Amino acid sequence: MSKKLTFQEIILTLQQFWNDQDCMLMQAYDNEKGAGTMSPYTFLRAIGPEPWNAAYVEPSRRPADGRYGENPNRLYQHHQFQVVMKPSPSNIQELYLESLEKLGINPLEHDIRFVEDNWENPSTGSAGLGWEVWLDGMEITQFTYFQQVGGLATGPVTAEVTYGLERLASYIQEVDSVYDIEWADGVKYGEIFIQPEYEHSKYSFEISDQEMLLENFDKFEKEAGRALEEGLVHPAYDYVLKCSHTFNLLDARGAVSVTERAGYIARIRNLARVVAKTFVAERKRLGYPLLDEETRAKLLAEDAE
């Protein structure tokens, strides 16, 4: 029987595969976020006319999902392997299935289903046509064609493939608990992450200072606005991410009512929309540097008319 891939070998295999498809290998973005989609490497780059092919691992924090390290499949923080390709290759689904083969999962020997699940992220004004990918009855990937990001229509269309690494590793290694996953030879997932899982859960549900978080949300929102007034897209977006994580902490603590919840989401969404518009305008001002010369000249000429 062949040796099963460790967690880090799964990452390395996916990195090599998508590198071979001309994706840039980016690194995780250094702000808390609830999903790889919220990284500027996806959120900002999915809008505007410039091409963008990237792949990266993104630790994703969801305070309300914390379970003190006691639930085998529910986590405060999990890891996503994110692939974004713009424009979307016509064979993106075939490429995805090929990536599974590289991980030792033969599509002809397993029940792999694309289950329609259109995607929406209200807090960033984003939506798209989507599918969950189920492997022998377990969801392992979200597949999305973005239609709107930051309130802006996308064009060309960006394809996003988001692998749930813990689920994928649990399947490949045939373990029932995420904490039994072998991260590297001789080192279990739980030996690395069960302590922070417990501590972050305790903090999110019991210890966090609600008043401080409420004040921070207001301050982060204001600072994002100040940065946008100066045309500083990336600092502004950092504060949008801080607003989002702060809201998630408040939500986990039960500090916001149903009515207030909608209001906070709208405030984050409004900021995200301004960030998106400002980013596109700034890329245009720079002359769309990632476009080829012919397309750039044509677009800039059309915009000038």
UniProtKB/Swiss-Prot annotation:
Main location: cytoplasm
Highest taxon, organism lineage: Bacteria
Keywords: Aminoacyl-tRNA synthetase, ATP-binding, Cytoplasm, Ligase, Nucleotide-binding, Protein biosynthesis
Secretion signal span: none
Catalytic activity: tRNA(Gly) + glycine + ATP = glycyl-tRNA(Gly) + AMP + diphosphate
Gene Ontology biological process: glycyl-tRNA aminoacylation
Major enzyme class: ligase
Matching Pfam families: tRNA-synt_2e
Stated name of the protein: Glycine--tRNA ligase alpha subunit
